[in-house]
């Protein structure tokens, strides 16, 4: 069972009190993934938010420029970080794929259930969505840098 203490270590929940985290913990379930497991695929329906407890998960996108196709890792999620945030943001479509580098343990929350909970407590909802917007901004910056790097490699070929 996921504890409030574990959730406290994730930046998504920064600013929440122990009793609030305990309520959110009730929405959580745990899952283990094997090395190289594909957790989700770009373009799919985003139903769950993932919190990484152990391991590393590569966030990848596929792209094609003329006849050149490739899969680029645009971010590597580390312990204590979240991914699959599209489950909380319309249109709830996955903007990338997620693949485990090695074994990984994750905490999962159904996005719809979490949003229903956040609707009931506007303060908690505000705190989490504020933290989420900072995360999305950071990931967008990381993705831009990673794509520039991949395009530069392509141009040099």
Where are the regions a protein language model picked out?
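Cytosolic regulatory regions built on CNB/CRP/Popeye-like sensor folds
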Residues: 1-157
């Amino acid at each position: 069972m996921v504890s409030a203490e574990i959730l406290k270590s994730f930046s998504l929940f920064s600013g929440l009190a122990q009793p609030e985290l305990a309520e959110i913990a009730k929405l959580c379930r745990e899952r283990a993934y094997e090395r190289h497991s594909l957790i989700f695929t770009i373009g799919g329906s985003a139903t769950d938010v993932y919190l990484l407890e152990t391991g590393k998960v590569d966030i990848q996108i596929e792209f094609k420029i003329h006849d050149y196709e490739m899969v680029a890792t645009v971010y590597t999620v580390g312990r204590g970080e979240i991914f699959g945030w599209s489950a909380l943001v319309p249109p709830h479509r996955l903007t990338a794929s997620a693949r485990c580098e090695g074994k990984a343990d994750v905490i999962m929350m159904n996005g719809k259930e979490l949003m229903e909970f956040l609707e009931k407590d506007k303060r908690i909802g505000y705190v989490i969505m504020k933290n989420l917007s900072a995360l999305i901004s950071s990931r967008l910056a990381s993705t831009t840098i990673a794509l520039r790097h991949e395009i530069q490699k392509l141009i040099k070929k």
